[in-house]
Amino acid sequence: MRFWLALVLFVGGLTAGSIGVVNQVENTPIDTIIASQQLDQPTTYVMIPNKLLTAYSASPQITVRGGEIFIATARQSDLVSWLEGSPYVELRLSIDIARETAELAEVLVSGNGNLVAPEGSDLWITEVAGRSRVSLDIEPDNQTAILLASNGLELAPRSISIERDISDKPA
């Protein structure tokens, strides 16, 4: 009888332990949020607005892939004025809570303005240029927005990724 009691308790302990491990694994908090997009809209300029940059408390890292790449940070009002009249794509954050995914959505802003090279404008707080792959860590404030382009005449880079490491942020 003692043997059967010990066996039942042992199997019950194993079952409770496995349920606890599975529950812990399923409910582990997310430490990284990655929103990426292959652009569908053909455009020369892409704007990442301040609202997207400040959606979470962690500082985002922007990674852009494709040909010639130019990334600039500026006050959003300055960036919108610089783009005024030119067609561009504004990125928005689309979150699917059920699937636990974050994607970038494109909003096309039409215009007939002139296309100009963005390099060297006095409106830019920071600017980075490169080829194939460029990354930029952003410290967002309540005004910063980002411009992505190539040389101002060619299409903007097509692959954009915004990554945030939230593992060390308090809940």
Which residues fall in each region the model found?
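Hydrophobic secretory-pathway targeting helix
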Residues: 1-29, 169-171
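Extracytoplasmic/periplasmic regions of membrane proteins
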Residues: 28-163
